[in-house]
């Protein structure tokens, strides 16, 4: 069989499976517990957090793990709206986002936020110009996926980030469980 749906689910590499098997077999304690299994799990979790932080050039206390992409998207979007809601109530996203982004946007609309949904161009991309035109003084968040999980269209996130920096909008959310690294 030729499997072509890696944007939905990708088989993990053998090294990942080996480490996960080891952790699930030998290090299954609750990392918040004070017994031996919990302490071991806490140590491994701290190591993982430090490795990810180092790879990102971030501080370990700024790295958070979630159960998956949907939880991460929800957390990021709702947190941004809560934190920045006093500054404005406008959010820009795309009409072709994953439901993990679209559903939180709909919930925020029900709470009084205004969401602009950008349509992709003929190639399936969101242009920087279209995004710039959608910005307003009360825009608090831009949420754009890097790679569309259904079409494979790749947005130029670096160009989007540069434009947002020039426009002095400091918060961008990128839903990115699809792109291979």
Language-model region placement:
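N-terminal "arm"/small-domain region of PLP-dependent enzymes with the aminotransferase-like
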Residues: 1-33
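Buried hydrophobic positions in well-ordered alpha/beta secondary-structure cores of metabolic enzymes
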Residues: 5-6, 20, 52, 69, ...
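Short, small-residue-enriched loops and turns at beta-alpha junctions
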Residues: 10-11, 39-42, 99, 122-125, ...
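Conserved N-terminal alpha-helix of the aminotransferase class I/II PLP-enzyme fold
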Residues: 32-71, 75
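Conserved PLP-anchoring active-site segment centered on the Schiff-base-forming lysine
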Residues: 80-102, 114-119
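Active-site core of PLP-dependent enzymes with the aminotransferase class I/II
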Residues: 126-128, 146-169
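Short amphipathic alpha-helix with an adjacent loop that forms part of the alpha/beta core around
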Residues: 128-137
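Single conserved hydrophobic/aromatic residue that forms the stacking wall/gate
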Residues: 172-181
């Amino acid at each position: 069989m030729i499997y072509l749906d890696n944007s939905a689910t990708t088989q993990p590499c053998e090294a990942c499976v080996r480490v996960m098997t080891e952790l699930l077999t030998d290090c299954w304690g609750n990392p918040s517990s004070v017994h031996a299994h919990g302490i071991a799990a806490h140590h491994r979790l701290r190591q993982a957090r430090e490795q990810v932080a180092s790879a990102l050039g971030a501080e370990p206390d700024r790295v958070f793990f979630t159960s998956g992409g949907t939880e991460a998207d929800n957390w990021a979007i709702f947190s941004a709206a809560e934190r920045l809601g006093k500054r404005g109530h406008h959010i820009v996203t795309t009409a072709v986002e994953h439901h993990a982004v679209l559903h939180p946007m709909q919930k925020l609309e029900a709470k009084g936020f205004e969401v602009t949904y950008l349509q992709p161009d003929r190639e399936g991309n969101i242009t920087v110009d279209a995004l710039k035109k959608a910005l307003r003084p009360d825009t608090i968040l831009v949420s754009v996926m890097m790679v569309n999980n259904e079409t494979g269209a790749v947005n130029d996130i670096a160009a989007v980030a540069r434009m947002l920096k020039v426009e002095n909008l400091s918060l961008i959310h990128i839903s990115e469980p699809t792109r291979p690294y």
